[in-house]
Amino acid sequence: MVYIDNIAAQEVLDSRGNPTVKATVILSDGTVASAIVPSGASTGKREALELRDGDDRFGGKGVLKACENVEVAIADELVGLSPYNQAEIDAIMKELDGTNNYSKLGANAVLGVSMAVARAAAKSLHMPLYRYLGGANGVIVPTPMLNIINGGAHADNDVDLQEYMIMPTGFDSFKEALRASAEIYHTLKKLLAEDGHPTALGDEGGFAPNFKNNEEPIEYILKAIEKAGYKPADEVNIALDAASSEFYKDGKYELKGDNKVLSAEELAEFYADLVAKYPIVSLEDGMAEDDWEGWKILTEKLGDKIQLVGDDLFVTNKTILAEGIEKGIANAILIKPNQIGSVSETMQTVRLAQRNGYNCVMSHRSGESEDAFIADFAVALNTAQIKTGAPARGERTAKYNRLLEIERDLLYPEYIGKELF
């Protein structure tokens, strides 16, 4: 019987130069597999807790305590167990932690081990990760949301909305869709440069210049789509991540880029005007995570027109999602494994969403690494959508390149962008 022989952890750097956990699992058959945990910038209040050292190293952001928890507390419980029972492994770590948000061991410690165990098990069985986790059902190569203009907490500019994304929905393959997206990205860079805008990049590889308001980035993206030779709405649509918790103050929404302070009703109307004017098919975190009344207003106004994605709202938590489903809040959920803390819990949330007709969008974090786990995970769970940044910066393209490999390797890959909306 193959069993877990050893578990190790190392402090490594993410794409923002901050420390994160790399966990390595060694099996008795000699299989070695590792996983690197991502980290977010705009985080929901109810996310699972990253354990940081809080000392002088790395401005308090070191993760040596989390690494120690992997090598001592977690390893003591898991060494000797079969790696092929993911649910059991994750349940043991959850019980060992004993809190509802992994504040004892750290979600960065637990998730690192959870991912590494899954990868080791797949490798030991000579299976690709997506096939190991998804079985024969994992056939949909997800339609990407590519964040090509960054604002909010992801950039040092005066744009309030955090992400302006393109969705290449009108193509027959992921390969074609990614090519179109890259061409649009490069065209956008030229357009910005021609107008005297700096083309510095934000955390997720998108451009981050200043604009006169929150609508101007959409105009630039539409120009780039057309100039690159593609058709807005027919081939390429627009998705937004407002990350509105970041500009929610005292029950109001402060849009500094537009010099406006809006109520939830007024903000919903602001979005409705954008949706009527532009080919916007998806809006993430349109209201603040604590403003459930605002979410109800937004869902009633736009829920039958576009995809309304809860990120900070649901934090990949099945209990919170169940409450949202019961109250008719949003119609889609962003899936970030490090928000909930383990592979198994992520899968449970996805299954709940899919059973109730909520779309799922697999997602990276702004602090990423070369680890492409979520690419396989998206295919395994048939999320049909993935959000992993611009077609630039190695930690972003690692996911896209892995999806290209998966599409090539699948016997009958499905790219269903045309059917999403």
Swiss-Prot record:
Signal peptide positions (record): none
SMART domains the record matches: Enolase_C, Enolase_N
Cofactor binding remark: Binds a second Mg(2+) ion via substrate during catalysis.
Entry-linked SUPFAM superfamilies: Enolase C-terminal domain-like (SSF51604), Enolase N-terminal domain-like (SSF54826)
Active site as annotated: E204, K336
GO biological process, one term: glycolytic process
Pathway(s) this gene product operates in, as recorded in its UniProt entry: Carbohydrate degradation; glycolysis; pyruvate from D-glyceraldehyde 3-phosphate: step 4/5
Keywords associated with the record: Cytoplasm, Glycolysis, Lyase, Magnesium, Metal-binding, Secreted
A GO term for molecular function: magnesium ion binding
Gene Ontology cellular component list: cell surface; extracellular region; phosphopyruvate hydratase complex
Enzyme class: lyase
PROSITE patterns: ENOLASE (PS00164)
Catalysis performed (reactions): (2R)-2-phosphoglycerate = phosphoenolpyruvate + H2O
Residues engaged in binding (2R)-2-phosphoglycerate: Q162, K336, R365, S366, K387
Cofactor(s) this protein requires: Mg(2+)
EC number(s) from the headed UniProt entry: 4.2.1.11
Identification of the protein by name: Enolase
Source organism per UniProt: Nitratiruptor sp. (strain SB155-2)
Lineage of the organism: Bacteria, Pseudomonadati, Campylobacterota, Epsilonproteobacteria, Nautiliales
